[in-house]
Regions:
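A solvent-exposed, charged loop/short amphipathic helix patch at secondary-structure junctions
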Residues: 82-89, 240-245, 342-345
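Active-site glycine- and acidic-residue-rich loops that bind
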Residues: 204, 250-257, 300-304
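Outer membrane beta-barrel
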Residues: 57-74, 92-232, 255-260, 264-272, ...
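Solvent-exposed loop/turn segments connecting transmembrane beta-strands
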Residues: 96, 123-124, 203, 253, ...
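Outer-membrane beta-barrel pore domains
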Residues: 75-77, 88-91, 134, 141-146, ...
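Cleavable N-terminal export/targeting peptides
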Residues: 1-53, 456
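Loop-centered beta-sheet repeat module
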Residues: 234, 240-288
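Outer-membrane beta-barrel biogenesis signature
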Residues: 43-94, 179, 196, 373-383, ...
Length: 456
């Protein structure tokens, strides 16, 4: 396994649009990086997706996190290994080096309750493209992809704080549905790669443009958001809503809106309980919006999306235990599947069928064995031995749809997390996907190192 879901091919990327988007995102990323390096750090915590609490107050905040990973997968990496399982049963192992995420966070407190926050994320070391002149094709200009990956402006918002219980935030926001989207930094999960279940069926990290009202009251924290809705044509069999928050265009269509609610409670010492949900219409939320016109055959197709999630974190007595359960539904799934299958070949939309529902359940527990060794404990070093269990299904189909057992996955993981200092972790784990159908299991070994924190 590598730090990206391997049960499906990557979405299609069309050349002209790809290079336009990549060149623009590179300019944004380079500008943000130079700006971040030239600034001083602060201590104000102005991000929902923060990596740590800064040490002292000042107007500027600079922080981030990053991960490097090695994976060895003892199964086929062929894209047809599920439908043609017998042909790939004895395939050789394969390995990968990767930089799954490298993030720079920059925030500023303008005063009088006004602040801003930005977060730029480089995935898989970023991306690169170039133009070359071919010497053997009459001097033809050629576009070359020199590096696969992504650069994303994951957060950009401006906030007005009225009271601790009333903060208004407008811009590109983290959507805190599920455990991983609200706690995605590498010190907030034990595995080398982000937990697989939620990362399969939900956008991750889910971020979108809209409005947020949030605050804290005693032992409660709440957040309410109105954002651009998901796109039904980007739901898929292997990843359900994972790609549905994205856009292949230079803007995000927002013909329909989504509504988000998250509540967290801290009443019990060492325990955080979270409840989150999303509701919105997903059909007719693309460009151009032609199928919603009066008297057209698909005008009344709505694609209602509901996602509910419950999660918790318990940290006490040298234990850390985390868990989550998610369930999502999509109305008109079979009709939407037919619409997707008949979109133009050149369109950027997935053509696979989409299920009426998807689910993900995960739990992990780790114990700090260095807590029993006085010297290590005094030096603030930690060594967690952990185990994790996941179950997820990205394609719960209705009676009119075909069955695909390989989307129902159980996964077990065992490993170690060593923290020589609080901001750095070395990770190692063994994992195996166990399929409920007659498919080949998928064992893997992963080793990684990560940091998370503010720089001053």
């Amino acid at each position: 396994m590598y730090c990206q879901m391997s049960v499906s091919l990557q979405p299609k990327i069309y050349k002209n649009e790809f290079f336009k988007m990549q060149m623009k995102t590179r300019r944004i990323a380079h500008l943000m990086t130079l700006l971040a390096i030239s600034t001083t750090i602060s201590a104000q915590n102005v991000a929902t997706d923060s990596v740590a609490q800064p040490a002292k107050k000042s107007k500027l905040t600079l922080g981030g996190y990053g991960e490097a990973a090695f994976s060895r997968n003892f199964y086929s990496d062929n894209q047809y290994r599920y439908p043609r399982k017998d042909a790939h049963k004895n395939a050789p192992s394969n390995g990968r080096f990767d930089i799954p995420h490298a993030v720079i966070y920059l925030g500023y407190d303008f005063g009088k309750g006004w602040s801003m926050g930005t977060e730029v994320e480089f995935e898989h070391t970023g991306t690169g493209s170039a133009i070359e002149i071919a010497t053997d094709e009459d001097g033809e200009y050629e576009h070359e992809i020199e590096k696969g990956g992504e650069v994303e402006l994951e957060q950009f918002w401006i906030q007005k704080t009225f009271r601790p219980w009333a903060n208004l935030r407008i811009g590109n926001l983290i959507v805190p549905v599920g455990l991983n989207n609200s706690h995605d930094e590498p010190l907030e999960f034990f595995t080398v790669c982000r937990p697989e279940g939620e990362n399969t069926i939900l956008p991750n990290i889910w971020h979108d443009t809209g409005f947020s009202l949030w605050g804290e009251v005693k032992n409660w924290k709440y957040e309410v958001q109105m954002i651009a809705g998901l796109n039904a044509l980007q739901f898929s069999r292997n990843k359900w809503a994972h790609n549905a928050a994205g856009s292949a265009f230079e803007f995000k269509p927002a013909n329909k809106y989504g509504f988000v609610l998250r509540l967290d409670n801290y009443s019990i010492d060492g325990l955080r309980l979270g409840l989150s949900g999303y509701y919105g219409l997903a059909m007719h939320n693309t460009y151009p919006n032609e199928m919603e016109e009066k008297d057209k055959i698909n005008d009344k197709v709505r694609g209602n999306v509901f996602i509910g999630s419950i999660d918790f974190t318990y940290e006490k007595y040298n234990w850390i235990v985390r868990g989550q359960a998610d369930y999502g539904t999509l109305s008109d799934a079979s009709v939407i599947s037919n619409i997707k299958a008949n979109t133009p070949k050149e369109s950027p939309f997935d053509k696979t069928a989409v299920g009426k529902a998807a689910t993900a359940i995960g739990i992990e527990a780790g114990y700090d064995v260095f807590s029993q060794i006085a010297k290590m404990k005094a030096d603030n070093q930690k060594l967690y031995i952990f185990g994790r269990y996941d179950f997820y299904d990205s394609y719960i189909h209705d009676k009119s749809q075909s069955n695909n057992d390989y989307t129902r996955v159980r996964k077990i993981t065992f490993g170690l997390n060593y923290l020589p200092i609080p901001q750095v972790v070395l990770k190692a784990n063994f994992a195996e996907r166990l399929f409920l159908g007659k498919y080949n299991n998928e064992p893997s070994i992963n080793i990684g190192i990560a940091y998370q924190g503010f720089f001053l």
